[in-house]
Amino acid sequence: MSGSGAMLLGLLILVAMATSLDTREICWNHSECDDPSEWCCRMGSGHGSCQPVCRP
């Protein structure tokens, strides 16, 4: 019983980690942006949007 419970808990943690990774802002230096002053891109919804600053 405890074995399957631990496996379920592990699966829940894995899903939570995957979703938190998906909505996180991923930053790099303006290689993907039209404006060289913009360098922060949000990758959550599959396409990044360039922004001048990166919010935590």
Curated annotation (Swiss-Prot):
Disulfide bonds join C27-C41, C33-C50, C40-C54. GO terms for cellular component: extracellular region. It comes from the Eukaryota. Residues 1-23 form the signal peptide. This is Conotoxin Cal6.41b. GO terms for molecular function: toxin activity. Keywords: Disulfide bond, Knottin, Neurotoxin, Secreted, Signal, Toxin. It comes from Californiconus californicus (California cone). Expressed by the venom duct. The cysteine framework is VI/VII (C-C-CC-C-C). The presence of a 'disulfide through disulfide knot' structurally defines this protein as a knottin.
